């Protein structure tokens, strides 16, 4: 409580940033709404709401300041989207290399998710389960490492980082799916789920060594080692099942 009470300037700056982000989202959303061509009355009411909000913000902070903030946020959004695209591309390259090591055809992954292929070959079904579990492990490892590092670096100000990342993630998704709001529903749900999982009721907050919970909980390194052991055991069992299926086919 003392940290939040003493952070008056930070709170005001965060409120200003939140208002500017809302204004930016309000300016981006009408384009997506108009591109879908949903009813004139709905678009007009939405535009009136956005115009009212824009006028109130302009009268509060000044029109010149709002325009400068819009330009700054537009440039910041472009750089942020470019950086996230590069990060996602790097993760995809690492993921494809892992699949290549497992002997999977990365160029045609849809063949492993085909219902006909899965029903005709039980080995494909087991391989599909292994790929899903491996993807879950890879995603958990990436998110766990990222948020653990952020929690160690920022400490009790981690909640500010969560709010900023959540806002920028929403901006990124709306920017990528501009004109197709229906396709943005699933990524937004994923971002909201990650936001709540990393909150005070989340796994990483409760069990991290520097968190407010019991310090006797296992560290992140021990959890990663445990996950690696589970993946090794899963690969061994999967190989045994595939070998037994091959032997039964040979007989």
From Swiss-Prot:
Most abundantly expressed in brain, liver and kidney. Overexpressed in leukemia and lymphoma cell lines, as well as in various carcinomas. It comes from the Eukaryota. Keywords: Acetylation, Coiled coil, Membrane, Mitochondrion, Mitochondrion outer membrane, Phosphoprotein, Proto-oncogene, Transmembrane, Transmembrane helix. It holds the Pfam family BRI3BP. Its main location: mitochondrion. The modification N6-acetyllysine is found at residue 229. It is found in: Mitochondrion outer membrane. The modification Phosphoserine is found at residue 248. It is a multi-pass membrane protein. GO terms for cellular component: mitochondrial outer membrane; mitochondrion. Residues 217-247 form a coiled coil. Interacts with LETMD1. Interacts with BRI3 (isoforms 1 and 2); the interaction with isoform 2 is weaker than with isoform 1. Interacts with BRI3; the interaction is weak. Interacts with TMEM238L. PANTHER family: BRI3-BINDING PROTEIN. Involved in tumorigenesis and may function by stabilizing p53/TP53. This is BRI3-binding protein. The lineage of its organism: Eukaryota, Metazoa, Chordata, Craniata, Vertebrata.
